[in-house]
């Protein structure tokens, strides 16, 4: 629960407020929120379920059980944060700081969950699956999904902010490992 609280806090209070996006499933949640006004608390479990179905066979039942708890708690924490205004000042005019702070929250939060045998989002399940079947480093598997979503994010986020998102996803992928 601690990892999902940290991660969701950072996404809501840093990324959602500053326009810095995340890659993978987290970035896809932000895309859906922007494109269709779908709340993060709804989009998160839907995307996660799809990714978990893909990863179930390679990662096993225990991973799925821990991840189910993490996914539900991630949605729960998003729901809690959505009931309050952001507690951090807007970092929209300080994108490098937003990228670094977001990377710290996400990397630490996801790292706690992954080290305890689960994932706090579908991109974790997908990256762990890719890592297991390909032998790639976990950070590389994360970057592949992140870069795909960041490319899609160019539809609503200027390249300058995508640049800062690249900083976030690169740093967070190495922090979690």
Model-derived features: where do they sit?
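Core subunits and conserved enzymes of cellular information-processing
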Residues: 1-177
């Amino acid at each position: 629960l601690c990892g999902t609280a940290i991660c969701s806090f950072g996404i809501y209070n840093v990324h959602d407020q500053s326009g810095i996006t995340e890659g993978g499933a987290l970035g896809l949640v932000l895309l859906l929120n922007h494109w269709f006004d779908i709340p993060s608390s709804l989009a998160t479990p839907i995307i996660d379920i799809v990714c978990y179905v893909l990863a179930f066979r390679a990662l096993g039942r225990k991973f799925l059980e821990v991840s189910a708890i993490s996914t539900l708690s991630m949605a729960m924490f998003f729901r809690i944060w959505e009931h309050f205004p952001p507690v951090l000042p807007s970092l929209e005019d300080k994108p490098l700081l937003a990228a670094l702070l977001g990377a710290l929250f996400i990397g630490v939060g996801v790292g706690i969950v992954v080290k305890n045998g689960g994932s706090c989002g579908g991109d974790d399940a997908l990256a762990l699956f890719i890592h297991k079947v390909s032998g790639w480093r976990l950070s590389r598997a994360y970057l592949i999904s992140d870069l795909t979503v960041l490319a899609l994010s160019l539809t609503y986020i200027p390249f300058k902010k995508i640049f800062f998102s690249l900083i976030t996803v690169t740093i967070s992928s190495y922090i979690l490992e």
